[in-house]
């Protein structure tokens, strides 16, 4: 069986050439297309441990932030604006994992709330279970912290991980995030 943590997907953006007439309708703005690539990764034992910690910290932070939002709303009838930085002092183990992964947890929770308020049929955000949740996290490219060279990818805190690169991304593709 294949673990969910052994898959990696890229979200890249690809611009179009100047000969495309749709670009001239918006002068100075290139047309962008989001493309996702999915590659299998082969982490070392040490990297598997850090991936497991990251999955756990993301799940823990999501649940903690959701619980705090619920409790604050019950007390004050106002929405709490909490960030991952607020939790790092109380829970020092959160400093061991990628900070952008924790920042994306906050964004995912905010999106869940927006979806709920936009359409209540979507349902209130739910707590994440250790046994029934998908082991994944998302990190963003900031100042070249994620690189792809040959059959390897460098991720924050994990360093270089070998991967099965079964196809080449488009030439003018920019890496935006990794999940």
In which residue ranges do the predicted regions lie?
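Nucleic-acid substrate recognition interfaces
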Residues: 1-179
């Amino acid at each position: 069986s294949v673990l969910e943590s052994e898959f990696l997907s890229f979200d890249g953006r690809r611009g179009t050439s100047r000969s495309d007439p749709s670009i001239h309708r918006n002068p100075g703005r290139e047309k962008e297309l989001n493309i996702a690539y999915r590659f299998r990764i082969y982490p070392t034992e040490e990297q598997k441990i850090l991936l497991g910690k990251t999955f756990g910290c993301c799940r823990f932070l999501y649940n903690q932030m959701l619980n705090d939002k619920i409790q604050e709303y019950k007390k004050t009838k106002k929405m709490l604006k909490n960030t991952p930085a607020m939790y790092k002092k109380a829970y020092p183990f959160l400093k061991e994992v990628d900070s952008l992964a924790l920042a994306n947890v906050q964004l995912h929770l905010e999106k869940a709330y927006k979806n709920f308020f936009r359409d209540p049929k979507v349902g209130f955000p739910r707590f994440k279970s250790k046994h029934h949740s998908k082991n994944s996290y998302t990190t963003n490219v900031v100042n070249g912290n994620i690189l792809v060279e040959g059959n390897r990818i460098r991720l924050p805190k994990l360093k270089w991980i070998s991967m099965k690169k079964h196809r080449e991304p488009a030439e003018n593709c920019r890496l935006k995030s990794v999940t």
